[in-house]
Amino acid sequence: VAKAILVTGATGQIGSDLVKELSKRYEGTQIIASSRKAQSSTESESLVHEVLDVTDSQRLQEIIECYGVDTIYHLAGILSAKGERDRELCWNVNINGLKNVLEAARTCHLKVFCPSSIAVFGANTPKFKTPQTTIKEPSTIYGITKATGELLCQYYADRFGVDVRSLRLPGIISYGTPTGGGTTDFAVEIFYRAIAEGSYTCFVRSETRLPMMYMPDAIEAILKLMQAELSAIKVRSSYNIAAVSFSAAELVAEIHKHLPNFTCNYQPDFRQAIADSWPSVIDDSQARTDWGWQHSYDLPAIVTDMLEHLSPKLAKGINRQGGRETPGAGEQGRICI
C-alpha cells in the first residue's frame, strides 16, 4: 500500500473521482490532490490540495519531497479537441509534464500511472477489434503526444526500471464534472441536454461508433492495474482497455427508452474527422489475461445510472448548460478523449 499518493490533474473528470475512491480504499494514506489552481474544497488529515503545474519540475519535486510521495497518478493533460486549437500547450503539458513525472519517478523510485488513449490510433489502424500491437499513426497532436508518451513510458521502464503503468483509455462517460474539450464529449453532453432541454445537437454523425467506458469501470481498471503484481505487467507502453462500443444513434435510442420525447439532430463539426480516425471496437484481451480486467457496465446500465444521477442534479438548477457554467474548470486533468 502506498504511503503517500500524488494525483495530478485532480480536479478533472477522472482525477476528481479517483481522489474520492483512493480516499475510500486507502484510509490513512496521504492523498495529495494537485491542480493548476487553488481549490476551496474541504481538506482532511489524509487529503490535502496543492497547486501544481506539471511543466514545473521544481515544484513537482518539492511536493514529492514534502509529503514523501511514493506513487503518482499522472492525470494532467490537454485533450484532443482543445489540443488542436492550442498545439503548443498540448505538447508542453502532455509531453514535458509526463517527462517531468518520469524523471521524478526515476530519481525518487516512484510508482506511476499514466493514461494513454485510443487517440494513438489513426486512419491506417484496423478499426474493428484493434489489437494490442498494431499500426498507430495518430492524426491529432493529442494522439501524437499520447503515442510519444507511450514510448517514454516504455523507455523509462526498460532503461531505468521505473514501474510505470498505462491504459489506452476510450471515451469516458461520467456525471461528476463538466466536459473538457474531448471528441467524445457528445456522450456526456447529450444527457444534460436531454434532461434540461429535451433536445441535443450532436457534433458527430449518427452512425459514428466509438469505444466508451463508464467512470466506475475506468476507476476500477486504473486501480486494478496498479494493484497487480509487477510480474503480471507484460505491456510497458500502454494496455488496450475496453468496455462497450456504441454509435451516437444507439445512445439516443437508449435514452429514448427513458425520455420518449427527447430529440436529437446531427451537425458534424471538425471533431467528426478525429472520430473517423479512431477504432470502433478495441481488443483488450491481453489486459483481461495479464491482470484480470473485466468491465461491469453495458450501455443500458450506463444510461440508467447517468439519468438517475443527473435528473435530481439538473432539477436543482445545477449545470443546466451541460456542465459549461464553469468552462475550462480542471481541464488539465480531463482525459476523456
Language-model segments: what does each one mean?
Residues K3-R25:
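N-terminal Rossmann NAD(P)H-binding glycine-rich loop of SDR-like oxidoreductase domains
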Residues E45-D56:
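Rossmann-fold cofactor-recognition segment
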Residues V54-V93:
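NAD(P)H-binding glycine-rich loop region in Rossmannoid oxidoreductase-like domains
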Residues H74, K99-I141:
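Conserved Rossmann-fold NAD(P)-dependent oxidoreductase catalytic core, especially the SDR/UDP-sugar
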Residues K82-G97, T130-P138:
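Short alpha-helical oligomerization interface
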Residues T145:
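Active-site helix of classical SDR
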Residues Q154-R209, M215-E220:
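NAD(P)-dependent short-chain dehydrogenase/reductase
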Residues F203-R205, P211-N319:
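C-terminal substrate-binding subdomain of Rossmann-fold SDR/epimerase-dehydratase oxidoreductases
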